[in-house]
Amino acid sequence: MAKAYVPRLKKQYDDEIIKAMTEKFGYKNAFEVPKLTKIVLNMGVGEATQDKKKVDQAAAEMELIAGQKPVVTRAKKSIAQFKLREGMPIGVKVTLRRERMFEFLDRFLTIALPRVRDFRGLNPKSFDGRGNYATGIKEQLIFPEISYDQVSTIRGMDVVVATTAKTDEEARELLRLFGFPFPADTTQKKAA
């Protein structure tokens, strides 16, 4: 009987990360160890107020990146200065969970981030105080699924990683063990 496929980062979490987190924070039970719950990708499409096709293009790109169909986000209220009416499509978002979440995270950390120009690591201060991490990407071209020739507009996106961690310190350690490229602690550099 063939074994079920397990994403690389899920296996790494089960085999190594739980053990390392338990040693560092002194958890009494493996279920206390923080874990990833979801990753939300959000792409705002401001040009959609003039051209409705821009949302469709963004949705197609997001589907290639995430591997699942995105939801179109709509304006909650009208804003005359932006020529925006309530209910107009203004972006797309995808929520990834379980295997797809781990697959995306693996591609994001090992393939996409190294392709960012002048990349010096992710901002270690982008935690929300509840153990969740948010970062932005300036262009969708860092993902290999997106062909440079087929892109009409370079768009950025938000990547939010939700965890069950109670504190930012626990979440930072969890993400560091997953391979998030946070720069070395700046306080240690100044002291040396």
Swiss-Prot record:
<dbReference type="InterPro" id="IPR031310">
    <property type="entry name" value="Ribosomal_uL5_N"/>
</dbReference>
<keyword id="KW-0689">Ribosomal protein</keyword>
<keyword id="KW-0699">rRNA-binding</keyword>
<keyword id="KW-0694">RNA-binding</keyword>
<dbReference type="InterPro" id="IPR031309">
    <property type="entry name" value="Ribosomal_uL5_C"/>
</dbReference>
<dbReference type="GO" id="GO:0006412">
    <property type="term" value="P:translation"/>
</dbReference>
<dbReference type="GO" id="GO:0019843">
    <property type="term" value="F:rRNA binding"/>
</dbReference>
<keyword id="KW-0687">Ribonucleoprotein</keyword>
<dbReference type="GO" id="GO:0005840">
    <property type="term" value="C:ribosome"/>
</dbReference>
<dbReference type="Pfam" id="PF00281">
    <property type="entry name" value="Ribosomal_L5"/>
</dbReference>
<dbReference type="GO" id="GO:0003735">
    <property type="term" value="F:structural constituent of ribosome"/>
</dbReference>
<dbReference type="GO" id="GO:0000049">
    <property type="term" value="F:tRNA binding"/>
</dbReference>
<dbReference type="InterPro" id="IPR020929">
    <property type="entry name" value="Ribosomal_uL5_CS"/>
</dbReference>
<comment type="similarity">
    <text>Belongs to the universal ribosomal protein uL5 family.</text>
</comment>
<comment type="subunit">
    <text>Part of the 50S ribosomal subunit; part of the 5S rRNA/L5/L18/L25 subcomplex. Contacts the 5S rRNA and the P site tRNA. Forms a bridge to the 30S subunit in the 70S ribosome.</text>
</comment>
<dbReference type="GO" id="GO:1990904">
    <property type="term" value="C:ribonucleoprotein complex"/>
</dbReference>
<keyword id="KW-0820">tRNA-binding</keyword>
<dbReference type="Pfam" id="PF00673">
    <property type="entry name" value="Ribosomal_L5_C"/>
</dbReference>
<protein>
    <recommendedName>
        <fullName>Large ribosomal subunit protein uL5</fullName>
    </recommendedName>
</protein>
<dbReference type="InterPro" id="IPR022803">
    <property type="entry name" value="Ribosomal_uL5_dom_sf"/>
</dbReference>
<dbReference type="InterPro" id="IPR020930">
    <property type="entry name" value="Ribosomal_uL5_bac-type"/>
</dbReference>
<dbReference type="InterPro" id="IPR002132">
    <property type="entry name" value="Ribosomal_uL5"/>
</dbReference>
<comment type="function">
    <text>This is one of the proteins that bind and probably mediate the attachment of the 5S RNA into the large ribosomal subunit, where it forms part of the central protuberance. In the 70S ribosome it contacts protein S13 of the 30S subunit (bridge B1b), connecting the 2 subunits; this bridge is implicated in subunit movement. Contacts the P site tRNA; the 5S rRNA and some of its associated proteins might help stabilize positioning of ribosome-bound tRNAs.</text>
</comment>
